[in-house]
Amino acid sequence: MLDVNNFEYMKIGLASPDKIRSWSHGEVKKPETINYRTLKPERDGLFCERIFGPMKDWECSCGKYKRVRYKGVVCDRCGVEVTKSKVRRERMGHIELAAPVSHIWYFKGIPSRMGLVMDMSPRALEEIIYFASYVVTEPGDTPLEKKQLLSEREYRVYREKYGKGFSAGMGAEAIKKILADIDLEKETNDLKEELKSAQGQRRTRAIRRLEVMEAFRNSGNNPSWMVLDVLPVIPPEIRPMVQLEGGRFATSDLNDLYRRVINRNNRLKRLLDLGAPNIIVQNEKRMLQEAVDALIDNGRRGRPVTGPGNRPLKSLSHMLKGKQGRFRQNLLGKRVDYSGRSVIVVGPNLKMYQCGLPKEMALELFKPFVMKELVGRGLAHNIKSAKRKIERMAPEIWDVLEEVIREHPVLLNRAPTLHRLGIQAFEPTLVEGRAIRLHPLVCTAYNADFDGDQMAVHVPLSAEAQAEARILMLAAQNILNPKDGKPVVTPSQDMVLGNYYLTLERENAVGEGTIFKDINEAQLAYQNGYVHLHSRIAVFAGSIPNERFTDEQRNQLLITTVGKLIFNTILPKSFPYINEPTKFNLEIETPAKYFVDTTTDVRAHIAAQELIDPFKKKILGNIIAEVFKKFHITETSKMLDRMKDLGFKISTKAGMTVGIADILTLEEKHEILEKAHDTVEKITKSFRRGLITDDERYERVIGVWNAAKDEIQGKLILSLDRLNPIFMMQDSGARGNISNFTQLAGMRGLMADPSGRIVELPITSNFREGLTVLEYFISTHGARKGLTDTALKTADSGYLTRRLVDVAQDVIIREDDCGTDRGLTIKAIREGTEIIEPLEERLEGRYSRKTIRHPETKEVIARENDLITEAIATQIVDAGIEEVTIRSAFTCNTKHGVCKKCYGKNLATGTEVEVGEAVGIIAAQSIGEPGTQLTMRTFHTGGVAGDDITQGLPRIQEIFEARNPKGQAIITEVGGEVVSIEEGRDRQQEITIQGTDDRRSYNIPYTARLRVEEGTIVERGEALTEGSVDPKALIRVRDVLSVQEYLLAEVQKVYRMQGVEIGDKHVEVMVRQMLRKIRVMDTGDTNILPGTLMDIHTFTEANRDAILSGSQPATGRPVLLGITKASLETDSFLSAASFQETTRVLTDAAIKGKRDELLGLKENVILGKLVPAGTGIGRYRKLKSEVIKETAEVTDEITNI
């Protein structure tokens, strides 16, 4: 038996007529499908049972042989083989064409492959194939030339003149004859000769022809196979015909297209037998050609064939293309059994690793397991009765169900799955009702809320799948976000509010300055109303079970609040007692100033102290990160649950409400507005007198109103009571921000009009007072724009993620160390004077390339190939080192992936990355997922003649697609000193740069803003004006590494401006994929074709062989490809075809006879194999498990894994 999942590679090629006949099980001669009375397939028709196999299992057509025992018998009456009906999905038929027909893919694609092989223009080919002109196939000894086109009249004239002295023909037959006559060897050698002298257009054409010729030569395909003599007919189950109610039939469009081909073919055969006049035969041949074209690719040439209702029919090509095509609909995304979906509701009392599964749903999902267990326990005699029991919902099944789902994790997924945290595993618990219960802390990762979101459940079946779900995907394991290594499960909303309220301090609260002997006493006093949560009190420090206190501190009093005492009970004992929201307190110890001797006057001491800020959302996040660093997964997930419970409990007790009385308006608002109106009036006067331009007036007016709004906002914040519920909500980070409050109580400020331009009429009212009709109207613009932008952005961002995933899907950690001697020198990324990404953030979790020493003491901070931890990174920055050389994905030598050392730490686990980790896909998701948070619009930068700089999502697309940027900067091609900046004609400026050996001048347009002045020293490739550099121009004047660094910095700028943090390594992986190819300039003595795009590794290998054999190596220059182009240029044709331009990719691959080595993930998913990543990678698949010893029954909780 052939193991379908065990093969090395997949190859595609052209099929010869004999090959097509060998696939076939018989010829389809009639266009009939099924008999309308008996509903049985017609013999020799498109559904014929004799050709394709029986309709019913183990039963021939006439019913003579029934049952399995006749397996393999061919019925003597009807000729049908007795076998399974499933063969109707795999058996093919064929149609013997009465005249050869050209294959539209090879004739019509761009460039026309047929045209390149024959060296004819596509126009000429079309005339021949569709019977408009004759072509000379054999000139004989006449003055005609081979492949010369003749019109009908010319043909007749030459026939009379030369008689049988030459042969010419039309249609695909003539093409076939010419193709068959081509001598590939001779043509190839001629083209190689021509290349030596040819220039310009002729050279390009010669290279393209040579490429196709070499492809045919190397693949063993015969050019004449581009013309079909036999047409394969795909199996009937793949183009089914089904009966609808009311006796009508629905059928696949392919059947209609096949019927047209068969009808025309049969008519042509009859005409040829009758010896019909040539013109009629020619017309029929042309119609046959068009019918086959429509079958293969309808609509590629001329008007598409339409079905009822003027709808174009779906041809074979359309079955593969697009989102609904075979590749994306059925091969890359399949529907799976053992799954369900339902609405989600919050489950605040669940543990971190649990989810609530509705009983009915669980019963259906785990049905086979329950049935097996029922039979096993003797509650049912056989599977059938077990099934009946379940359908009747007998009471005894519930206990069995609980037993079955215990320790059997399920996967929960929420669409859209933007990153890997969109699918996580949970341990199910049964709940009443029909809604899935979700743990509140995982909502951030799923981006879920409970306003009607739905989620899907999947059951991992095999033991291996369950183990992977539990060990790798359990929600308690996914605490860190893969994009930046920060915790993704931070408390939100009510939980934040509760912990904020708990840790507030209040002056002169009830019982301030009371001294307690321990926590219990303090809590008792609080419950009886003697002290408040916010009262500052003293507690005997020795009673607090904290291992960080010194012996001296244990004998002192700790100044804290009741709330903070309660808050600290949720933290591990060896964690510092957190009394203030500072980094010092978090990472090192509780500051000494909070400890006082027992003799101190506590009340006076407290009265002299400032109030400490409560713990906001950010601090809670830092606490989680710190706990994770020190105690890892189990302890963190328990702590998170405690923090969640505490937050919910206290926010319930706090009873925060928002009433209209909480929104207090500002007394001085009227004065501020008056002042602003006066200033605007003055600006308008200056404009009327012609002192300033309209643009300047506009900018200044906007400035005035923004200043007014800011002033109101500032005074509002100062006038607010710290205990105002709205203020507490926004200050804690639970919900809303200060600008929401300003709009409620201050003024709404300026709005944007539909084009995104700011309207200079401000909205001076706030929501508390109410808006005037005009103000309301102005504000509708902005609201509408916000919503449309969001909708458009989501689609754009999703498509960006898809392209990123496609280009990086085969980047996997393949080995431990690639042994490279190159590295990337990094420093902090800056925009002007502002630091966008500091050096320590870029260093942490990377391997050093060289030994790093302290500049003064010369002591070693990190050795070569050491992992730089957070502590080492801080040391490096503190030592004043500004740039460090690290191992980077840019310089990694690993083929088809990167190595562990060049990648560094896995951000999602905080540990070293494992071999087999699919870092490409993680990188793509990390860049794509925050895409929805980026803005859409191009910002209008200040300044009168300011260019629009693209930012946000459009800028990210521009970078990754390597497009020419908007507002492009002019770069210098020489390094040296700027010697002069002069004003040329048309108010242009001319910059002259004196290099070491040459001098260049650049004309700068009048509107551009300069970045250099006379005397500036510039490097090659440096920008002379403000704006974005075109990376394709940069790669021409600088090396690859500078382009990579530039792209990395640009991507980071966009994301950091929007407050999104992404690890450098993700961008590095993507940029590495854009620069994988090299364009061959000079072929040397290798047999590479000039102008070919090839993988750098393949290129180096070809050159290595050339150098070793002592011949001249080829030279090439690196090429920067946009991600779409890079995806289509991948070595895997399956991956490229399933991405975009399916027909073009397949045409090309077929001619080249390409092999797909199945290295990426996508190709393997398409073929239904295990992906070569994670546990599916070769080195893990070969491991065999063995039992060392049986373990005792484990009763421990799942969290301890």
Curated annotation (Swiss-Prot):
Catalysed reactions, as listed in the record = RNA(n) + a ribonucleoside 5'-triphosphate = RNA(n+1) + diphosphate
What EC designation does it have?
2.7.7.6
Cofactor: record remark: Binds 1 Mg(2+) ion per subunit.
Quote the record's binding site residues for Mg(2+): D449, D451, D453
Q: What are the recorded Gene Ontology BP terms? A: DNA-templated transcription
Q: Which UniProt keywords apply?
A: DNA-directed RNA polymerase, Magnesium, Metal-binding, Nucleotidyltransferase, Transcription, Transferase, Zinc
| DNA-binding in keyword set | no
The enzyme class is transferase
Q: What is this protein called?
A: DNA-directed RNA polymerase subunit beta'
Q: Which GO terms describe its molecular function?
A: DNA binding; DNA-directed RNA polymerase activity; magnesium ion binding; zinc ion binding
Described purpose of this protein according to its UniProt entry: DNA-dependent RNA polymerase catalyzes the transcription of DNA into RNA using the four ribonucleoside triphosphates as substrates.
Tell me the domain of life.
Answer: Bacteria
- Give binding positions for Zn(2+) 1: C60, C62, C75, C78
- SMART domains, sorted: RPOLA_N
Binding residues annotated for Zn(2+) 2, in chain numbering: C818, C892, C899, C902
Name the family the entry cites: Belongs to the RNA polymerase beta' chain family.
